[in-house]
């Protein structure tokens, strides 16, 4: 069932809001310009760090012993990332010997969706009709339903066996990721910044015997709201805990989730073959620091050649450069459009005229934004690459 709200805004209110938005538009232009400038410097310096590291990196075929001759050198090596550390989730008691153990928590909640339609009125005013709809979804964190617009979902108390009404949770946990402190790489030890990049996580195989059911039951809180909605008679907290596959489900029935139910999924990252590029420091590694201050290190899953790893690094740097360029241009164009928007509102007493002027402002903002962005990029290119330009 949808809930609607209608808001009428006068021409004067719209004009005042448009002029207030000019300052925001100027900030957006400055922000977008700074992003474009900074990105060109970042791209150039990152490329320099990659090139500097590439010249200095040497292949190491044997990592079965610590070689003092490699101290302080940048190396490329392939080997097994292994560990004997036992990781234990403090809240659920789940244990495994692995490089990483992750916990993902989801809550079954009412979520609010809105859709607005604005109609311009003769005289410059606007009428905005906003429709709010609600659906049950699994989300990453509890949703504060007191901010919902429909009172039936924000403040109203549900009738018996009716799950309309405020959100609720049976328990409150957060996502967490645990990492092994001792991960071997041949005779060397991988530092945390490389350990955290190891992928290949797989679902845990859980059973009621492998989790701390008592600790979970203590964390469960069956509110009056949940009981009134779903429970015909009081139940013990441990009766609401279900373990199957890689998931611990907190609720009555995993097959028919209710508002307030919680599900927690566990994954483990087993030992794996990896390839790294990093600077040797005693029996471990650190990031290579280039002469321009930028750092460089890489970890790839499986066996990857030095050439492939550097090509991937260059490709990622180039891709990020274009992503940030596009973002910067969009921000500049949006800022210009916001600065010029009062012109459209000024003629808004005639809706058709406002539409025409608005379309013109959009085109002008796009052209000016592109031109200004290209100027900023060109000047930044000359600033950071004087020899190339």
In which residue ranges do the predicted regions lie?
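Alpha-helical transmembrane signal-anchor/signal-peptide segments
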Residues: 39-63
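Cytosolic-side membrane-insertion boundary helix
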Residues: 11-18, 291-334, 358
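Alpha-helical transmembrane segments forming the membrane-embedded cores
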Residues: 7, 320-324, 328, 335-389
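Hydrophobic alpha-helical transmembrane signal-anchor segments
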Residues: 13-42
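Short extracytoplasmic
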Residues: 56-91
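Domain-level marker for long, solvent-exposed, non-transmembrane regions
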Residues: 2-5, 38-41, 76-78
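N-terminal Lys/Arg-rich, disordered targeting/topogenic segments
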Residues: 1-13
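Soluble non-transmembrane domains of integral membrane proteins
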Residues: 80-82, 86-283
């Amino acid at each position: 069932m949808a809930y609607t709200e209608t808001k009428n805004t006068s021409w004067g209110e719209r004009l005042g809001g448009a002029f207030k938005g000019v300052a925001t538009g100027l900030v957006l232009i400055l922000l977008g310009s700074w992003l474009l400038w900074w990105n060109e410097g970042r791209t150039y310096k990152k490329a320099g760090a990659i090139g500097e590291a590439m010249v200095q990196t040497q292949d190491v075929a044997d990592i079965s012993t610590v070689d003092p001759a490699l101290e302080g050198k940048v190396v490329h090596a392939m080997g097994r990332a292994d560990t004997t550390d036992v990781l234990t989730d403090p809240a659920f008691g789940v244990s495994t010997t692995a490089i990483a153990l992750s916990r993902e928590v989801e809550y079954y909640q009412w979520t609010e969706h809105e859709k607005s339609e604005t109609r311009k009125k003769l005289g410059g005013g606007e009428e905005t009709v906003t429709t709010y709809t609600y659906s049950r979804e699994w989300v990453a964190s509890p949703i504060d339903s007191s901010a919902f617009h429909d009172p039936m979902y924000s403040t109203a108390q549900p009738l018996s066996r009716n799950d309309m009404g405020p959100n609720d949770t049976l328990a409150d946990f957060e996502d967490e990721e645990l990492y092994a402190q001792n991960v071997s790489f041949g005779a060397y030890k991988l530092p945390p910044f490389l350990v955290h990049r190891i992928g290949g996580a797989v679902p845990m195989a859980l059973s009621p015997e492998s989790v701390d059911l008592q600790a979970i039951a203590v964390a469960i809180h069956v509110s009056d709201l949940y009981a009134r909605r779903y429970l015909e008679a009081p139940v013990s907290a441990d009766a609401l805990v279900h373990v199957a596959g890689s998931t611990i489900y907190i609720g009555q029935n995993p097959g028919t989730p209710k508002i307030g139910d919680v599900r927690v999924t566990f994954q483990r990252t087993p030992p794996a073959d990896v390839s790294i590029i990093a600077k040797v420091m005693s029996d471990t590694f650190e990031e290579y620091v280039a002469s321009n201050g930028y750092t460089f290190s890489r970890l790839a899953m499986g066996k990857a050649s030095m050439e492939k790893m550097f090509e991937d690094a260059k490709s990622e740097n180039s891709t990020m450069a274009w992503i940030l360029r596009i973002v910067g241009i969009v921000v500049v164009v949006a800022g210009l459009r916001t600065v010029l928007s009062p012109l459209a509102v000024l003629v808004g007493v005639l809706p058709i005229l406002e539409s025409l002027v608005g379309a013109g402002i959009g085109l002008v903002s796009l052209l000016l934004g592109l031109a200004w962005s290209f100027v900023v990029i060109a000047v930044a290119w000359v600033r950071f690459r004087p020899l190339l330009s």
